[in-house]
Design a protein with these regions (language model features):
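Extended amphipathic alpha-helical segments with heptad-repeat/coiled-coil character used for oligomerization
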Residues: 229-263
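Short, well-structured alpha-helical segments that form the helix of a local strand-helix-strand
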Residues: 212-223
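N-terminal mature-domain region immediately after signal-peptide cleavage
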Residues: 5-210, 224-225
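N-terminal secretory signal peptides that target proteins for export/translocation
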Residues: 1-3
Length: 263
């Protein structure tokens, strides 16, 4: 009887060790991502952090989960960034203004501000996707309840969602994009295309668009679901200075995408 119990315990121990090793191997690149987290400023409450995203993500897989509500959006983000672990996240809110100018050397500069009603730390997110363009983007850490992302394990895990909650960014081709809020009814397109949500649009453009026109075409190939009960538009510009305001026509029930060149 004792021999049988020992064998059972041994088998259970082996299974536990295999599970632990498998989990560690699966999360290795995510652990490295967390280890890259660095505090850039040193203020008392809210700070700037940076992080290198070293795990592979699949935007097409994320989209395939199906998005028709804020909860669908959150579930899709968590499935792609932190599978198997329970992490709390709230749908983000946005405000803001954006602009672009040409400097004295005719280089194109793009800027934006945040009109947040609450204070937040910011995370500079550096992504080098295998099949996409390198980019830097900013995420508001208050949106994932992680204003001090190095304070606990749960907050460190929460920052793994950062690639999919950025509010603006620029890629290696010079394409810049920012999301800005509107007071109109939230866009919920239902034309039969796959659906993306507000901040996923930013990640798609940064990873896959080399020009403003490519960004517009990319966004037009999906239905849009505006998150958090708000409506939004995007400001997109590229290295040539081609700037467009991309919005979804409030005067048409189908909410078709409209891209207006800046003057």
């Amino acid at each position: 009887m004792k021999k049988i119990l020992k064998r059972i315990l041994l088998v259970l121990l082996v299974l536990v060790l295999l599970a632990v090793c498998g989990f560690a191997a699966f999360y290795f690149s995510r652990i490295r991502t967390i280890q890259s987290l660095e505090k850039v400023t040193d203020y008392e409450d809210y700070n700037l952090y940076r992080m290198d995203v070293q795990y592979s993500y699949d935007l097409d897989r994320l989209i395939s989960y199906g998005i028709s509500s804020n909860q669908d959006m959150l579930d899709a983000i968590l499935k792609e960034s932190i599978p198997l672990l329970p992490i709390h996240m709230t749908a983000p809110n946005y405000g803001c203004s954006a602009f672009s100018i040409a400097d004295s050397d005719q280089e194109i500069l793009m800027g934006r501000n945040y009109d947040f009603k609450i204070d937040t730390s910011s995370l500079l997110v550096h992504c080098t996707p295998k099949d996409g363009y390198e980019s830097v983007a900013f995420a508001a850490l208050s949106n994932i309840s992680a204003n001090q992302p190095d304070a606990s394990l749960s907050k460190k895990l929460a920052v793994l969602t950062a690639p999919f909650i950025c509010l603006d960014g620029m890629n290696e081709k010079g394409v810049s994009i920012a999301v800005l809020t509107l007071d109109s009814e939230p866009t919920v397109q239902q034309t039969g295309k796959q659906t993306i949500f507000t901040t996923l649009a930013i990640r798609l453009v940064l990873d896959r668009a080399a020009t403003t026109q490519e960004a517009v075409d990319l966004l037009n190939s999906y239905d849009m679901f505006a998150t958090s009960g708000r409506d939004y538009h995007f400001y997109i510009t590229d290295a040539s200075g081609d700037g467009r305001v991309v919005e979804y026509d409030c005067d048409d029930p189908a909410r078709p995408l409209v891209a207006t060149p800046i003057r």
